[in-house]
Regions:
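A membrane-periplasm/extracellular boundary helix in multi-pass inner-membrane enzymes
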Residues: 2, 166-181
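Membrane-interface junctions at the ends of membrane-embedded or membrane-associated helices
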Residues: 95-101, 142-152
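Membrane-interface segments at or immediately adjacent to transmembrane helices
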Residues: 183-208
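Hydrophobic alpha-helical bundle signature of multipass membrane enzymes
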Residues: 1-75, 81-112, 158, 197
Length: 208
């Protein structure tokens, strides 16, 4: 693959870094509060905990014993999970058709996962796990959004706050683009140091 194409893929993949995702989620939550959508705000917040907490548990579990020969699933892709859920949930929460948001999230999951594989950062198995976790969060949010639409008595009108959100997300993403979160290194260290003693890790013998 040409170096220019790899650089372009890396550029877009960086929009899924945690340094960008967390501020974007903060903007999402703030807009839900401004719109007085309290119920779906708490449902969305619970799913944030499920998706990111679930990824935390998976990483600690799979990385504990270190990378073993022939192992295809070592570090589930939090990048793919986060990108899928954060940007997919934006479309579901603030779009007119929740199902369109779900389809959009699926497209994001495929592109984000493929990018991580092309960049040789994760295996196919690792991005599949991450994408599945992110899509699970989006799916549950889609159901919640449909219930919100069915129970809402207000007629949907153009909301300029959504435009403000998009502008804010764009500013945040471009401002923080390229900054690398150290979370991955910290998780790997914590897993090796504190989780591994509770696991029955296989012992690999070196030959001399």
């Amino acid at each position: 693959m040409p170096d220019g194409l790899i650089s372009l893929i890396g550029f877009f993949s960086d929009f899924g870094d945690e340094n960008i995702l967390w501020p974007v989620m903060a903007l999402n939550g703030l807009l839900l509060i401004v719109q007085a959508r309290r119920k779906i705000f708490f449902q969305w917040l619970a799913l944030v905990i499920v998706v990111f907490g679930g990824m935390l548990v998976l990483k600690l579990e799979f990385e504990a014993c270190g990378r073993l020969p022939g192992q295809n699933l070592y570090s589930p892709s939090g990048h793919t999970a986060g990108t899928t859920f954060v940007y997919g949930s934006m479309i579901v929460l603030f779009g007119r058709l929740p199902i369109a948001g779900f389809v959009g999230a699926l497209a994001i999951a495929l592109l984000a996962g493929a990018a991580r594989v092309w960049l040789h950062v994760h295996s196919v198995a690792e991005v599949c796990v991450g994408g599945a976790l992110g899509m699970l969060g989006v799916l549950l949010l889609t159901f919640a959004r449909y219930r919100e639409i069915q129970t809402s008595s207000k007629q949907k009108k153009p909301d300029w706050s959504v435009v403000v959100l998009l502008v804010g997300v764009l500013i945040v993403a471009l401002s923080l683009h390229g900054l690398r979160s150290p979370a991955e290194v910290w998780l790997e260290y914590f897993s090796h140091r504190f989780v591994a003693p509770f696991r029955h890790c296989p012992v690999t013998l070196s030959t001399t």
